[in-house]
Amino acid sequence: MQMLSVLNAFNSFPLAELEVGHHFYWQLGNLKIHGQVFLTSWFVISILVVASIAATRNAQRIPKGIQNLMEYALEFIRDLAKNQLGEKEYRPWVPFIGTLFLFIFVSNWSGALIPWKLIKLPSGELAAPTNDINTTVALALLTSLAYFYAGFSKRGLGYFKKYIEPTPVLLPIAILEDFTKPLSLSFRLFGNILADELVVAVLVLLVPLFVPLPVMALGLFTSAIQALVFATLAGAYIHEAMEGHGGEEHEEH
C-alpha cells in the first residue's frame, strides 16, 4: 500500500508527456478514417492551389515574387524528371513527379513550421500528413500504379518478360520486388518524418528555448531531402518499368 501511495504521488507531478498515434476518427458507414490527416492534407493542397493561382494570375515576362519561385520549382522538377526518365520520355511524367515532390515537400515542412499541436480537437491531434503511415502508403501505391502503367503502356505484354529475365528462376524475387518497392518508399518517408517530429517534440519539452532550433533547421533540410528522394525513386522506377533492367542508360545532358 505504501508503494502504491508513493507511485500515485509521483504520478501527480506535472511531468511532460508525449503521445504518439492519438488519432481523431471520422465514421463513414462502417469505415473509420483519420480525420486529422484529411484536414492537414487539404490544408497542404490549398497552399499549393493558392500558390499556383497567385503565380499564374498575372504572369509577367520577367518573373518575380511568387511567379519566380514557382517557375524555379517547375524547372527543378523538370530537370529531375529528365535526369531519371531521359529526354524522350520525361515530359508526360513531369506533372506526376512534380505533384509527388511538392505535396511531400509542403507536407513535411508544414510539420516542422506549423504548430499543429496548438490546435485543439475533440480527440487526437493534428500533424503533418506524411506523419501518418496511411498517407505514405497511399503515395507509394500511387507510384506503384504509375510504373505498372508506364511499363505496360510502353512495352505492352512484353512488360511481363521482366519477371522471367534473365532466367525464370528469378520469378519469385521479381514478384517480391513489386511489394518491397512501395514498402521501402512508404516506411522510409514515414519513419524519417515521424522521427524528426518526435526528436523536436522531446527537445521542446525538455529544453524549450534555444536547443531545439538547430534540430528544427536540420529537420527542414531532412524534410526537403525526403521529398527529393521519394520523387527521384518514383522517376527511377518508372524509367525501369519502361526500359527494363537491361534498358538503355540515361541520356547525358
From Swiss-Prot:
GO cellular component: plasma membrane-derived thylakoid membrane; proton-transporting ATP synthase complex
Keywords in alphabetical order: ATP synthesis, CF(0), Hydrogen ion transport, Ion transport, Membrane, Thylakoid, Transmembrane, Transmembrane helix, Transport
Key word Membrane present: yes
PROSITE patterns assigned: ATPASE_A
InterPro entries: ATP_syn_F0_a_bact/chloroplast (IPR045082), ATP_synth_F0_asu (IPR000568), ATP_synth_F0_asu_AS (IPR023011), F0_ATP_A_sf (IPR035908)
Chief location category: membrane
Cross-referenced Pfam families: ATP-synt_A
Name of the protein this chain belongs to: ATP synthase subunit a
